[in-house]
Each structure stands twice: as C-alpha cells, then as structure tokens.
Amino acid sequence: MLKLFRYLKNYKKESIIGPLFKLIEACFELAVPLVMANIIDVGIKNQDKPYIYKMGGVLVLLAFCGLACALTAQYFAAKASLGFGTALRRDLFKHINSLSYAEIDSVGSHTLVTRMTADINTAQQGVNILLRLFLRSPFIVLGSIIMAFSISVKLTLIFLIIAPCLAYAIYLIMHITIPQYKNIQKKLDKTNLMTSETLTGARVIRAFSRQKDEEKEFADNTEELRRQQIIAGRISALMNPATYVIVNFAIIAIIWFGGKTVYSGSISQGEVIALVNYMNQILLALLAMAILVTNITKMQASAIRINDVFDVEPSVSDKDNKPVATDGNAPCVEFRNCFFSYASAEADSLSDISFKAMKGETIGIIGGTGSGKTSLINLIPRFYDVRQGEVLVDGVDVKEYPFSQLRGMIGIVPQKAVLFKGTIRHNMQWRDKNATDEDIWNALDIAQAKDFVEKKPDKLDEMILQEGKNLSGGQRQRLTIARALVGDPEILILDDSASALDLATDVRLRKAIHEKTSGMTVFIVSQRISSIKSADKIIVLDDGKIAGIGTHSELYNGCEVYKEICLSQLSEKEAQANG
C-alpha cells in the first residue's frame, strides 16, 4: 500500500493542510465541554442570563469555526484523493498499454478493468478518509484524556481504564470482521467477473439455451456473497452496543464518583458534565478509528491487487524512438527458424517456421483450426516475441524496431472487426491522423465500403455507435479493412477478415487490393481456399508446423494437407483450376 502513496507527491500541500484543519476542528470540539461547564457553573448557578447568552454565542462561534475547518479539510482531502486516483489511474492505464498480448492474456481483460475501476475507486476513497481521520481521531482520544486530567486527576483514572477497554473491544470485533471483509471483496470480484462474462457472452449463452444454468450459477454466487455479508454485518453490529455499554458504565462511574466529589467541593457540576462529554468524544473518536481501519483494510486489499498489475513486466519491451535503417533489398518479411509458445501452454504453438515474403507479394496462410495461423501473423507486428529464432522486416529484426516505426509500416485487420464510437472519419484516421478525405475515400473504395458509406446521410461524418452496433457484420469488416489501408502501409495483414463477406464481395475486395496496392506485401489468413488460391505464395500450417509452401498448383499436387483442405471445399475440377 505504501507504494501507492507516491501518487500523493504532487499533493503534499493538500495532504498537510487537510489533516491540519481537522486537528484545528478537533481543538474547537475539545473546547465545547469546557464552555458548557462554565454555562452550568456560572451562568445557570448564578442565573446570569447575559453570561449564558455570551457563552451560547461562544458555542455557536466554536460550531461555525469547526464547520469551516471541517469543510476546508474535506476540500483539501478530496482534492488530494481525486488527484491521487487520477494519477494512479493514468499510470495504471499506461502500464496496461505497455503490456504485450501475453501478459494481457495471462491477467485477463476483465481483471484489468476491475483494477482500473473498482480497486482504484476503493483506494481513492481510502485516501480521502485517511487524510481526514488518521490524525483527528487519536488526537481527540488523547486530547479528551488530557482535558479530563486538567479537571480531575482522580476521575481521569476512569478514562485511563475505559479507553483501553473500548479500544480492545473495537479491536476484537475488527479482528474478526476484517478477514470477513477481505472474503467479501474476493467474492464481489468474482461476481463482477461473472457479470462481465455473462454480458459479453450473452449471445452464446442464448444460442445454447444456457440462461437457466447461468442464472443458477449467478444466484449461488450472490447467495454466498449475501451470507458472507450477513456474517460480517452481524459481527460489526456488535460494535455499537458493546462500546456504548462500556461507555455507559464509564459515565455511571463518572457521575457516581463525580457526584461525591461535587459534594466535597473538589469539582463542580459543570465539570462532571464536561467529563461525561469527553467520554462521549472518546467513544465517537474510537468508532471513527474503526471506520478508518476498515477502509484502510479495503484499501490495502485493493492496493495489493493494483500493485500485482504494476509488478507484471512486459515481455515485449519497446526500443527508443530512434528509427532504424532498413535494407531495401532484403525480403519484406522473413521468418528464420522461429519457435513460439504461449505462457500457459506446455507445447509450442509454432515450431521451426522459416519463409520469406518479398515486397509486393501476396501470401496466403491456411490451415486447420488451431494450426497457428493467427499466432504466426501476430509475430510480425511483434504482439508477441518468438521463443527462438528471428522475425525480420526489411532485413531488420522486429526487436530492433521502435513500436511506432514497426507498426506504422503495417496495416492490420484482426479477426474480430473492432470499431470505436465516433464518426467514420475518426475511425478511418486511426493509422494516419493526417489522412485527407481523398485518402479515406480511396481506402473505402478498395475495401468495397465506398457505396454504403456514400448512402449514409452524413457520409464520413456518420456516427458509429460503440463497437459499431449500428452497422452489419460485413459493413464493420469492410470499414476495418479500409482503416488498415489508409496511409498505404508497406505490409497489410488480413486475419480471416472476410468471414462476414459474401463470395462476390470477397472476390471484388481481393481484386481491388491486388490492382490498387502495387508494392504492398499482403498476408491473407483465411479458411476459404478461394480467398488464397491466387496468392503468389501459400503457406500451409498443420499443428504449428509448415506442411508446405508454394503456389496453389504446387501445393495441390505436392501437399496432402492442402489437397485435403481443397477437396473439402471445392470439386476436384475447381481445385485443379489455377487462380
């Protein structure tokens, strides 16, 4: 938890002023019982109304001064805690963006969202309460005992006996409840994760008619959470009765022994009332400390989870921003004896991959499900690093490139078409912020998206809803292809990006890419033979290994894996035809 306090370094002034004003407020609060004692001993005893009014005015003044100090403290504590949360959220977001696919896969995107939202909010609230109470509550307890000591040394013994008893009672209850609250937080995280997964996979759940099963699992989880909360709540509910019983015994003792000392003339009636008020102040301060400790416990649990994310080191690190010189005569992309495996996998996903893709070539990649097609093309923009071997772009190892240079050379169309809320123009300018409308329309034309965009009322200024919900699957895919084409990348990667397109549109798309992107090296990952049949070179993957490389006719006649795929989709006559 202490690691996170560095985010308060820009709010040192607020972190000092907030607690300081809380101490000043506490001083005003400690003065109130003495003023009340004077009203009783002087004003009421002597029936001196002017004095009562005067002291009443002092009480009002103390109340207003205390309120002003409390509001000031709250302002500075809120400013510091909000700044803390903003800085922490910014750095965590930056750190998450620095992680490679491997780390994100390992931690889980749902977990990262929870850390960014719920855990940071908990830590932020903890800082706010900490700045307001960590000095005030102990100061009130100590101050009340000192003020009681100044009134009566003998009666202060009651305070010295009761205060530890109160503290121990609160400690005992919290010692039991804090582990309960930690379990509640874990179960709450599980509930949040389950909710997120259910909402994300709602269509799949309905497709398999799993609603009842999911509802039962969710109900069981929330019931377990409810039981845990009830247990913690019942134990926590003992705090107020237990502490008030102890305080009431203390008040009885003060009144009993104080009454005797009043008769003997050692102290006055007002001073006895002041002692009772100080005892109540101690009680409230200790209860506030209990709230503080509870929030610190929650904050600590959240801080541990946040630090766990910060402790994840990116396996793929960026070089400095100095561009590297490339070799214009080298192959555009070259794999040299590459081996790759996922962090949680026991076996390699790719084994001994070697091939060259020259500038301007179209490379088709095909293979069965799980053969490693997406894993292979994810190594080119360095989303993952190879375990062994080299991946070169323009003769330079991808590890030597700054991310900005390497990924600036590559246009990527992922399997899932992802669009962002905003205009079509905004989405098209993701690769090149300075892309003109002409550049965008050219890319839309190649991607077979120009016609439907022109029919939109606002054309390029048409708003796209979150995740492109107001577009069909085919429209989303064509827009993501167009986005990758904006800026004329040196390398274009199409990862099964025509799955939502009909065959006619797919043919027109491949023809347009071939005719209008001369010099661009294109990688087409597809399950369709028709999509890669006319490629200059086809790579056939089988269980992470290259089963064959060549043209369609070469592979059909010399690679059994490729021939089997062909005949599963085409007639023998169609399969034997070239292009």
What are the residue ranges of the model-derived segments?
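Alpha-helical transmembrane segments of multi-pass membrane proteins
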Residues: E14-S15, F21, L62-S81, R132-F139, ...
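An intracellular "coupling" helix at the cytosolic face of ABC transporter transmembrane type-1 domains
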Residues: N10-K13, S98-A102, A118-L131, L135, ...
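Transmembrane helix-loop-helix hairpins at lipid-water interfaces of multipass membrane proteins
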Residues: K9, S15-T72, F76, F149-K154, ...
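Hydrophobic alpha-helical transmembrane segments of ABC transporter permease domains
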Residues: L20, I24, F28-V32, G57, ...
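Short intracellular "coupling" helices and adjacent cytoplasmic loop segments at the cytosolic face
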Residues: N46, L82, R90-T114, A118-I120, ...
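ABC-type nucleotide-binding domain
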Residues: T326-G579
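Helix-loop-helix
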Residues: Q47-Y51, G57, M147-I161, I231-R305, ...
